[in-house]
Amino acid sequence: MEQIITGDGALVSNLDEKITSSGIADAGVDYHTVAIIGPQSSGKSTILNLLFGTKFATMNEQRGRQQTTQGIHAAKSVNDPILLFDVEGCDSRERGDSDALFERKSALFALALSEVLVINMWESDIGRYQASNIPMLKTVFEVNIQLFLAQNTTKSKILFVIRDSTAVNFEAIKFQLNRDITNIWDEINLPDSFKGKQMEDFFEFLYFPIHHMVIQRDQFDADVNTLRKWFNEPPLKDYLFAEKSTKVVPGEGLSQYIRNLWEVINENKELNIPSQRTMLARFKCDENAAEALSKFNKFVEENLQRDPDQPITIIQDFKPLCDKSVENALKYYHDNSWRYSEAVVKEREAQLKQEISDVLLPYFNSQCKLFCDNTLKRFNEFISSIDQELHVGGTWESDVQGKIDSLNMDLKKNIKDTTVEPFSWNYPDYEVMKVMFNATESMKGKLVKQLEQTIITEQMRSFDEQANDILAKVDNLMWDNLRNLIRKVSTETTQNTNQVLKTNVSGVHARNDIKRDFQTHTISLVRESANYIVLKMKNTFDRTFKYEKNGRPRVWTRRDNINQIYENSRDAGLKVLRHFTYCRLAESDDEVKPNDPLTQVLIPHERASEIEDKFERIIIHAYEEARANIKAQANREQIPGWAWLATFLCSSNYIMKLLANPIFFALAVIIGGIYSILRMLGLQDVAKKTLLDKFNSLLKNLTKDENEQEKEGEENEEPEEDQPLPNNNRKRMKLMEKSVSQEFSQKSIYKSSEYKGSGDSLMIPQTSPLGNNDSPEKPRDSLTRTQSLEFM
């Protein structure tokens, strides 16, 4: 090494190269520092060269005494890791009066860097103020106090090398030098914090005499060898580096430290050694951290980065690869930074970890997202593979929850196995759980709804059959039977649903409004059935009017009270209409609101009146036909028996002639046999009526146009009798018919009556205006409000 600070007080530009070439940069903290100060031309460079094998420039005696070392020079010991600083001598002629300022700066620099400060002085100068460099010593003491103020440093070792020593009693020289040092210390104004301190609290003074190099060469060489051992032989009790010094900085940061230190000293700023050390530590730690991060980024680029056009895939060895790379990066940083301030090293290490974490975290999140996507994919596959219906004894929810738990454990394990040490990353896997939970709840709701719909659909089949049977009968218990059926089927549906839900899902039960579903469905069935209300009324009328109670077709005779039968049959048909007038599905425990469908009007008043009119027009034909049959029978019964006998006798020849023909004879036997059998069974009247109906139907088909015209006329006019009624005066009968017509010309029950209160009753006539039962008259066109029939 050569000059590091010029005589003008400027740092050389190639300081880094010089420190590196000396080998100190690679020494870490395993090196020592020694600085030497003293008067100009006192042999400072010479003694360093002799002690450490360096090649500092020395004075050329042929040119006389002059300034040889300008500024500060540095060199490494040839055989030992000791960095030497050769400081420009004081009291030089060249500097003159400006010497004091540079002397102070160089002394402060030497004390700040060196573990041992060597003061080279002549024995002959001891005891003289200027000659013994008392001002220089005073400067050393003052700047050392300044260092102590800035840091709690170790004592400064000051080695006085007494040149050209001739004293027999060296102790006397030491005493005299100590006296001078004490006097200097007493003149120094100590800070308040150091009041009462002795100079021994700040300095460790050592003394070593060296004989004259020319006159006493052998002794001089022996003295140099002895002094060298103080620097390079640790076992020696006088070894100067026995104690660990706080002044040594890591070799790789020494150049930066020197640069910062001299900048502060040269600008006369307050020197803060700990601050400078911290600055150096931060600088080097930043430098090492940047290099470690660069190496790590290279690893990421080579192993983790993927082509943007390629799909992201799971990296199987993600954690081992990253663990190893992170470990290498941190190891590189620690190996190159551990010599600096521990606090700074740890602080920057934490920052480096965060920087590495910031680089790795996106890759970690990407891997975790793939795990989550794979988990959801497996979950969806499982949901699709299981039965899509709930069954008795099934365990749908527990099976799904078990799968979710298993997938969640796998996901957490994958995330944990992907987390790189020493980072504590957390991936929000709860989002996956939320998605699976929502999907499960949605699927559960769908299956429960599907189950209810399936069970209700199955129940509806039998319900429709039973409900239609009830609606077809249209009796007084129709609404009671419908309510009982609804109650029964809704209870069964609820029980069946809960039986399936009990083992499949928890906390879910059948809907409370299942009964309402059946009620609503029943209303639709009733409305559908009400579309055929006229047909139902006609069928009910026919069952009563045209058939006996035992189900046989009615054969009308003069003994039948046709008017009463007609009235009863007509009332039965009208009762069907009343049953369908309004809905009666509400029960006592049902919550019925205003305008509730369970109590709604099914057939409005105006519509009911129209239906009744149509019903009246339809059933009148059956009444007229029955009257015609009775009249025909009456006419037949008026022919006397002798007339039939006379007719038979007059026709006997013709009859015998017919019977002589085998064909007619066979027909007569067959017809006679059939008639005898029917008579024995009591079915002759039924057979007669059937034949007459067939005959009449045939006639109607043959005279279709005429019948249609007659039908239109009958709808607009009252039917007239074609034959006089037997056993009654024709004139009296017409007067009675006129009276009956006037009495029953009122509107029908649904035209004249109003719905009252709950609509439970309507009025119909209670007595027949017809007189004698044996005198059949035309049926009443309408009913008077004299009879009350309760609604069911």
UniProtKB/Swiss-Prot annotation:
InterPro entries (UniProt xref): G_GB1_RHD3_dom, P-loop_NTPase, RHD3/Sey1, Sey1/RHD3-like_3HB
Localization per Swiss-Prot or TrEMBL: Endoplasmic reticulum membrane
PROSITE patterns for the chain: G_GB1_RHD3
Keywords: Coiled coil, Endoplasmic reticulum, GTP-binding, Hydrolase, Membrane, Nucleotide-binding, Transmembrane, Transmembrane helix
Database matches in Pfam families: RHD3_GTPase, Sey1_3HB
UniProt cross-references to CDD domains, sorted A to Z: GBP (cd01851)
Top-level taxon of the source organism: Eukaryota
Protein topology in the membrane: Multi-pass membrane protein
Start and end residues of each stretch annotated as Disordered: 703-792
GO process terms (BP): endoplasmic reticulum membrane fusion
Positions that bind GTP: G38, P39, Q40, S41, S42, G43, K44, S45
Membrane-side (Lumenal) residue stretches: 660-662
Cytoplasmic-side segments: 1-638, 684-792
GO MF term set: GTP binding; GTPase activity
Class of the enzyme per the UniProt entry, highest EC level: hydrolase
Transmembrane segments: 639-659, 663-683
Coiled-coil portions: 691-718
Domain spans labelled GB1/RHD3-type G: 28-245
Biased composition (Polar residues): 739-751, 764-774
Biased composition annotated in UniProt, kind: Acidic residues: 707-723
Family annotation (PANTHER family): PROTEIN SEY1
Family statement drawn from the similarity comment of this UniProt entry: Belongs to the TRAFAC class dynamin-like GTPase superfamily. GB1/RHD3 GTPase family. RHD3 subfamily.
The protein, known as: Protein SEY1 homolog 2
Originating organism: Trichomonas vaginalis (strain ATCC PRA-98 / G3)
